[in-house]
A protein has these predicted regions:
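Conserved beta-alpha
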Residues: 1-178
Length: 178
């Protein structure tokens, strides 16, 4: 079993051509699409594109053999911790390192004309509120999961979950913001 937690995990996994005979699981549609570029069809959770969604998917079938969870350094270890606690042989591989910028000045300018911000990770929320957000801004915040909503709430801001992988993202944004 090989579980990819993000598109970046796929991009940075240097042995991608050696996993043909493995059960491949992707965290969500974006990760699955990245695997398709290498001609792999991955299983993905039905709805909840999260660690919990992966765990639910795994629990629907028999887990056999070893499992490798490929992720970014500093990413969540919920899947590995769950599998290890259930006595399944599980390893993690950090295929990339998340890095913050030295300066956010240029990026901050890009938000000056924005009406909303979509957050796809807890790290993006942290960076935004620590380095980019201006308290005078009246932006609306959207999150790709309830977990990200909770992180946004920790900054005392409200947000809504959006189906980021919708076939019509523009319409999804309009529906969510109304």
């Amino acid at each position: 079993n090989i579980i990819f937690q993000s598109p970046s995990a796929v991009i940075n996994f240097d042995q991608i051509n050696l996993i043909e005979d493995k059960r491949i699981i992707a965290m969500g549609p974006g990760t699955s699409n990245q695997l398709r570029k290498h001609s792999y069809v991955a299983e993905i959770p039905d709805k909840e594109y999260s660690s919990e969604g992966i765990i639910n998917l795994l629990n629907k079938s028999e887990i056999t053999g070893k499992t490798l969870v490929i992720k970014g350094e500093g990413g969540l270890s919920i899947i590995s911790e769950y599998l290890n606690s259930a006595s399944f042989k599980t390893d993690e591989l950090n295929a990339y390192t998340r890095q913050k910028f030295e300066s956010y000045g240029d990026i901050k300018k890009q938000f000056s004309d924005s009406d909303f911000v979509i957050f796809s990770s807890a790290l993006s929320v942290e960076i935004y509120f620590k380095h980019i957000h201006n308290d005078q801004e009246t932006l609306k915040f959207l999150a790709v999961s309830e977990r990200i909503v909770d992180v946004i709430k920790s900054y005392k801001r409200e947000s809504k979950v959006i189906d980021y992988f919708s076939n019509d993202l523009v319409n999804e944004i309009k529906l969510t913001l109304t």
